[in-house]
Amino acid sequence: MSDSGSQLGSMGSLTMKSQLQITVISAKLKENKKNWFGPSPYVEVTVDGQSKKTEKCNNTNSPKWKQPLTVIVTPVSKLHFRVWSHQTLKSDVLLGTAALDIYETLKSNNMKLEEVVVTLQLGGDKEPTETIGDLSICLDGLQLESEVVTNGETTCSENGVSLCLPRLECNSAISAHCNLCLPGLSDSPISASRVAGFTGASQNDDGSRSKDETRVSTNGSDDPEDAGAGENRRVSGNNSPSLSNGGFKPSRPPRPSRPPPPTPRRPASVNGSPSATSESDGSSTGSLPPTNTNTNTSEGATSGLIIPLTISGGSGPRPLNPVTQAPLPPGWEQRVDQHGRVYYVDHVEKRTTWDRPEPLPPGWERRVDNMGRIYYVDHFTRTTTWQRPTLESVRNYEQWQLQRSQLQGAMQQFNQRFIYGNQDLFATSQSKEFDPLGPLPPGWEKRTDSNGRVYFVNHNTRITQWEDPRSQGQLNEKPLPEGWEMRFTVDGIPYFVDHNRRTTTYIDPRTGKSALDNGPQIAYVRDFKAKVQYFRFWCQQLAMPQHIKITVTRKTLFEDSFQQIMSFSPQDLRRRLWVIFPGEEGLDYGGVAREWFFLLSHEVLNPMYCLFEYAGKDNYCLQINPASYINPDHLKYFRFIGRFIAMALFHGKFIDTGFSLPFYKRILNKPVGLKDLESIDPEFYNSLIWVKENNIEECDLEMYFSVDKEILGEIKSHDLKPNGGNILVTEENKEEYIRMVAEWRLSRGVEEQTQAFFEGFNEILPQQYLQYFDAKELEVLLCGMQEIDLNDWQRHAIYRHYARTSKQIMWFWQFVKEIDNEKRMRLLQFVTGTCRLPVGGFADLMGSNGPQKFCIEKVGKENWLPRSHTCFNRLDLPPYKSYEQLKEKLLFAIEETEGFGQE
């Protein structure tokens, strides 16, 4: 017998709730000759009040599901499996049952469940001993800390009886008593008679067991029936917590509506052993005083509240050493109901709970407002909340805030390609000092692009133009005819749009002169909508019926998506997508899939994975990284990314990050050349232009048909043609040299990656279906438009139970106008699932049932937070009483909400 002074382990790991993924693989059932067609089985998994079901397999005795189910369990939970046969016209028939103890499975697998395959024998419904088949399952995602592995169990033996029990945690205010609600016993050896008191049976001196109930003598009782019946109370094996497979089987009944009041008790003594330690007030410690008990050595001494545990030794029974537990917060009290289950009473808020309350984290304070409502103040962040904070919730929030800041940093880096550097701002300030035309009008700014061309920004209307606003009107130009508009190309060349005939031309209708000699006609911009409609038509022709389910977790989004997308056939990926985030209540009618595309594109295109890189120092468009070969599976990932990008185009979803224009040209099977270098590497482009326009023989540059490239710090030489290192570049062959260098720069070291990308891309969407688009149109088709037109948003919004003149609607649009563009995108993402807009703007927003405009509906009370339905582009806006309240609630909703089913 080990010493009674051994340390008891903490119960925290055994009662901690964790997520467990159960994959129901298959089953083998005995054939029933009465049923010719065979059963249509499905599996129901229940644990701790949760129930999950698989899909049915029609008419088979060997069903195969391979369906993952996610449940919330504790290490001492018990899984119950029921195999049912689906019946069409009557109730389903139970074929067999099986049970699995999680704690025993953890012990046999080193306290870790990682893809553990278990085969269970199914017992009959009427005769449990009869085996009707086998059920194969796979458990994954649960791990117990090493502390529990080393101290989690103790095998004790007395008089021939062996026990294997998990450890027990005792209340700090009771040195020799433990609560009935605890999930097991201690690490220290416990006498067999003491355990017999738990199970309702005692053990005689000869080692035999006799069925005898434990008598408990009480001086007071919380139960009126016990108090009225007498002082003796019987606790049988059925009423006491049973020990099953070495652990306590917890039960969670409905919360008691009116718990019994506490009754003062006297200190207890067991066989002359020292009494319990001095009691503390229930409001401060939450522990209940023990009951005065008189027992025999063969009987378990207990009360309706607590059970004293003794350790048998050479000198007689000794009390167990208690495990120190944090005291209850002020105003809380610990009680035990008539079934021995511990619950906690909050005398301040007048409520009860099963969970032990924790003190407030450092820096938090509890306050009460004028209406008597309790709220909590965080003095670190100077924020308030109605939800009671815990150490775990604060830690999870800090971790989420860190991840969110990292995500925002990545998005900010992507948006920096639209921010001009300090040199441009310095040049602008210098030009203002010596500008002979004087200062610009209010709200205007003069800027210079990467090629040195000057343009002007009107911050009032958020537009840019090539002409100087100070010189407009000085030439006394005639106005354009009605229906005409003058625009400028990316090169600053003016052209004219005739909205009456829907045509464009370089010829000025006022003078009849052309801006270019024989300039080509530019396609009318609205033709792009016709292209999109034509493309969507062909996607519908290629689409497959029904849908496929994609189950991914937010923590392992990249790897889960990779495994599932690569496991499906290309035809299955053309079906309608049904994306599931385990543990969230969102039903995917389009909104969840939009968020999945948005989040996954941010992951797979992240340069940190070394699959893609930024096109240049000041260009945050993405291109394939030549050094991706350091990942041995990089070609598989590029094939996966090709499938993913094709799925985004095929299903009409947007991605978070865009590619470089030459990469879009490759997707369109269009040739790339020297001109494409300008957008990704202006310095390299300008150097080639200088070589083209100057005599290199006079400069004696000694260039050869060979180039150097640096990958991961290693410089390698590449010949543009066979034996190119010995072929000198001259005036006669420099055109060939420039062409080959440009092709090499645009495709250097990425041939295999590009081939793998298009292999996956063409499996979903053949490239010939995109031949009608150009590179910029493809970028808009894949990424959507980023700039939000407030007038277009307000013009195409609809309302339910509100009117355009309602004060809440007017406050909402005032709020949208006041916030910056980033928060507008967040608001748009909160309501629609993505911050990208379709090509046609808000007029072309799509929902689960087709076109669905942005909708604001009057729902809830003024103290509710706004809710959204991303599948229907609908915002549930409660009738707030003031603009400040509406602004506060909306900001909290769009900044702090993540996932679905979060109230």
From Swiss-Prot:
It comes from Homo sapiens. This is E3 ubiquitin-protein ligase Itchy homolog. Pathway: Protein modification; protein ubiquitination. The modification Phosphoserine is found at residues 240, 273, 450. It is linked to Autoimmune disease, multisystem, with facial dysmorphism: A disorder characterized by organomegaly, failure to thrive, developmental delay, dysmorphic features and autoimmune inflammatory cell infiltration of the lungs, liver and gut. Its EC number is 2.3.2.26. It catalyses: S-ubiquitinyl-[E2 ubiquitin-conjugating enzyme]-L-cysteine + [acceptor protein]-L-lysine = [E2 ubiquitin-conjugating enzyme]-L-cysteine + N(6)-ubiquitinyl-[acceptor protein]-L-lysine. The keyword Nuclease does not apply. On T-cell activation, phosphorylation by the JNK cascade on serine and threonine residues surrounding the PRR domain accelerates the ubiquitination and degradation of JUN and JUNB. The increased ITCH catalytic activity due to phosphorylation by JNK1 may occur due to a conformational change disrupting the interaction between the PRR/WW motifs domain and the HECT domain and, thus exposing the HECT domain. Phosphorylation by FYN reduces interaction with JUNB and negatively controls JUN ubiquitination and degradation. One of its GO terms (biological process) is proteasome-mediated ubiquitin-dependent protein catabolic process. Changing residue 420 to F: Greatly reduced phosphorylation on T-cell stimulation and in the presence of FYN. Increased ITCH-mediated Ub conjugation and degradation of JUNB. Residues 569-903 form the HECT domain. The lineage of its organism: Eukaryota, Metazoa, Chordata, Craniata, Vertebrata. The modification Phosphotyrosine is found at residue 420. It is found in: Cell membrane; Cytoplasm; Nucleus; Early endosome membrane. Activated by NDFIP1- and NDFIP2-binding. Activated by PI4K2A-binding. Inhibited by DTX3L-binding. Inhibited by N4BP1 binding. The gene is ITCH. Acts as an Acts as an E3 ubiquitin-protein ligase which accepts ubiquitin from an E2 ubiquitin-conjugating enzyme in the form of a thioester and then directly transfers the ubiquitin to targeted substrates. Catalyzes 'Lys-29'-, 'Lys-48'- and 'Lys-63'-linked ubiquitin conjugation. Involved in the control of inflammatory signaling pathways. Essential component of a ubiquitin-editing protein complex, comprising also TNFAIP3, TAX1BP1 and RNF11, that ensures the transient nature of inflammatory signaling pathways. Promotes the association of the complex after TNF stimulation. Residues 395-471 are annotated as: Required for interaction with FYN. Residues 236-247, 282-298 have a biased composition (Low complexity). The keyword Nucleus applies.
